[in-house]
């Protein structure tokens, strides 16, 4: 078998284990120990999802990264940028989405940013608005395109997510289907 095949198998196993960790984060109640809206809280989520899978689990990256033609925040200024993002207000839906978009631009980890940040976003929305995103209703292509355009204009991602808010914040099915959808956005599909 070619080496590429083995890489695909390894990545799929990492995603599968990380997904199980995400389920456990909620089922165990450990989600209630996460610091909401902070960089530390995002690091806690990332560590929980990827501990034992990546040596950098929960650690702020120290190298530059990009996806496609987009370069995320420069590693030299990342901690300063994260400090500014942390201070952003969380009093309205618009402000929360603005903070979410800025955290996505920062992309503090080498891998696993989207999965971690979507959980982080839901915690902020739940705390301040009593709502979460019903991710299972958010189309993958529309979401990824809106996020790609969000550094220029966050209106599209705001409308997309606002149309899929629910106040059923403790519904187990919404939570777990949302986690699965989050992994699907990143290319993982359960067998």
Swiss-Prot record:
Enzyme class: transferase
Keyword list, A-Z: ATP-binding, Nucleotide-binding, Nucleotidyltransferase, Transferase
Keyword Transferase recorded: yes
InterPro entries noted in UniProt: Fido (IPR003812), Fido-like_dom_sf (IPR036597)
Fido domain span: 37-162
Keyword Transferase part of the UniProt annotation: yes
EC numbers for this chain: 2.7.7.108
Catalyzed chemical reaction(s): L-tyrosyl-[protein] + ATP = O-(5'-adenylyl)-L-tyrosyl-[protein] + diphosphate; L-threonyl-[protein] + ATP = 3-O-(5'-adenylyl)-L-threonyl-[protein] + diphosphate
Taxonomic superkingdom: Bacteria
Gene3D superfamilies: Fido-like domain
Binding locations of ATP: 67-68, 112-114, 118, 145
Family of the protein in this entry: Belongs to the fic family.
Function recorded in the entry: Probable adenylyltransferase that mediates the addition of adenosine 5'-monophosphate (AMP) to specific residues of target proteins.
Protein name (Swiss-Prot/TrEMBL): Probable protein adenylyltransferase HI_0977
């Amino acid at each position: 078998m070619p080496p590429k095949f083995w890489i695909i198998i390894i990545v799929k196993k990492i995603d599968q284990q990380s997904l199980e960790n995400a389920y456990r984060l909620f089922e165990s109640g450990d989600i209630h120990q996460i610091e909401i809206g902070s960089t530390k809280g995002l690091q806690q989520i990332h560590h929980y999802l990827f501990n034992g899978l990546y040596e950098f689990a929960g650690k702020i990256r120290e190298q530059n990264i990009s996806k496609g033609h987009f370069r995320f925040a420069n590693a030299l200024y990342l901690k300063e940028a994260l400090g500014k993002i942390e201070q952003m207000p969380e009093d309205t839906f618009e402000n929360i989405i603005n903070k979410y978009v800025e955290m996505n631009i920062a992309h503090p980890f080498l891998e696993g940013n989207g999965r971690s940040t979507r959980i982080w976003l839901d915690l902020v929305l739940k705390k301040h608005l009593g709502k979460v995103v019903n991710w299972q209703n958010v189309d993958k292509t529309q979401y990824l395109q809106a996020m790609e355009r969000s550094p220029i204009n966050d209106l599209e991602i705001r409308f997309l997510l606002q149309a899929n808010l629910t106040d059923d914040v403790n519904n187990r099915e919404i939570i777990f289907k949302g986690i699965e959808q989050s992994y699907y956005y990143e290319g993982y599909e359960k067998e």
